[in-house]
Amino acid sequence: MNGRVDYLVSEEEINLTRGPSGLGFNIVGGTDQQYVSNDSGIYVSRIKEDGAAARDGRLQEGDKILSVNGQDLKNLLHQDAVDLFRNAGYAVSLRVQHRLPVQNGPIVHRGDGEPSGVPVAVVLLPVFALTLVAVWAFVRYRKQL
């Protein structure tokens, strides 16, 4: 094992309605205070209980926010990003990047048309290898008789 964690990355559009406590989450990052090494993106650092984001349930701590109401968050100072969120209005559209760690083990069935187990090649390859070894051993044994 190399100690590296692989991730699946997915993007999602999340629409939130501002509540009494705002959008219900805190952010970190920006060009002046990078949260992730070599990445000046804006990340969710905390979801506030009973806030708009917590009630919606899709935004998670660690998610990268790519845009707010269509405005790209690349190369912004942290305070400029905060101001953009504060002035985004009542209905806010977020383009979010989720990073999900890849888990080892069999794929779980999720529904029609989706992967439902171990890929066929993973099963057939060892069976094929064992068959070749058995045939080789049989041929060698027969030559000795």
Curated annotation (Swiss-Prot):
GO cellular component, alphabetical, reads: cell surface; mitochondrial outer membrane; mitochondrion
Q: How does it assemble?
A: Binds (via the PDZ domain) to isoform 2A of SYNJ2 (via the unique motif in the C-terminus). Interacts (via C-terminus) with RALBP1. Interacts (via PDZ domain) with ACVR2A (via C-terminus) and ACVR2B (via C-terminus). Forms a ternary complex with ACVR2A and RALBP1. Interacts with MAPK12. Interacts with DLL1; enhances DLL1 protein stability, and promotes notch signaling in endothelial cells.
Q: Could you confirm whether the keyword Membrane appears in this record?
A: yes
Name the predominant localization: mitochondrion
Q: Which UniProt keywords apply?
A: Membrane, Mitochondrion, Mitochondrion outer membrane, Transmembrane, Transmembrane helix
Membrane topology, Cytoplasmic segments:
1-117
Biological processes annotated in GO? intracellular distribution of mitochondria; negative regulation of angiogenesis; negative regulation of endothelial cell migration; negative regulation of endothelial cell proliferation; negative regulation of ERK1 and ERK2 cascade; negative regulation of sprouting angiogenesis; positive regulation of activin receptor signaling pathway; protein targeting
Tissue-level expression reads: Widely expressed.
The molecular function terms in GO held by this entry are:
type II activin receptor binding
Its biological purpose: Regulates endocytosis of activin type 2 receptor kinases through the Ral/RALBP1-dependent pathway and may be involved in suppression of activin-induced signal transduction.
SUPFAM superfamilies according to UniProt: PDZ domain-like
Annotated PDZ domain residues: 13-100
State the compartments where it is located.
Answer: Mitochondrion outer membrane
Q: What is this protein called?
A: Synaptojanin-2-binding protein
Task: Spell out where the chain crosses the membrane.
Answer: 118-138
Side Mitochondrial intermembrane, residues: 139-145
Record InterPro entries: PDZ, PDZ_sf, Synaptic_Scaffolding_LAP-MAGUK
Taxonomically, which superkingdom? Answer: Eukaryota
